[in-house]
Amino acid sequence: MSVSRRVIHHGLYFAVLGPLIGVLFLVLYIFFAKEPLILLVIIQVLPLFLLMSITTGAIPAMLTGVMVACLPEKIGSQKRYRCLVGGIGGVVITEIYCAVIVHIKDMASSALFENILSGENLVVRIIPALLAGVVMSRIITRLPGLDISCPETDSLS
């Protein structure tokens, strides 16, 4: 598979599925670490919650997918290293993206954006970015449209 095709596929898959995986882990984190009653509030506003996660997470997820697609063959063919780089890259890219948005005051004008992007809610950004980066790096070779056949990545064990 050509590098440009792999970059397009990885970027799109990460952008579409990454924020959704992040929301799943964030909801589980809120349910187990915080009060379970907050989960009822989140379920009531789930469409808005998904929209916010996609608007704040799609671009960092896409950039993480492009980064994973551009990994050298030695690193990209090994599951552990690909997941490690995907997770760390997801966190770093998300934090850089949020720092840029905070400095652009027009985009961060609403109270909801300012609350999400504030330093107090660092765990709300780091956990979904880390876990979505790791999970997407792990399953990216199994998604349709990618002709990656590497013995190291073909088994899910």
Curated annotation (Swiss-Prot):
Residues 33-36, 105-115 are periplasmic. The keyword Nucleotide-binding does not apply. Its main location: membrane. It is found in: Cell inner membrane. GO terms for cellular component: plasma membrane. The chain crosses the membrane at residues 12-32, 37-57, 84-104, 116-136. It is a multi-pass membrane protein. It comes from the Bacteria. Keywords: Cell inner membrane, Cell membrane, Membrane, Transmembrane, Transmembrane helix. The keyword Iron does not apply. Residues 1-11, 58-83, 137-157 are cytoplasmic. NCBIfam families: PRK09823.1. Belongs to the CbrB family. This is Inner membrane protein CbrB.
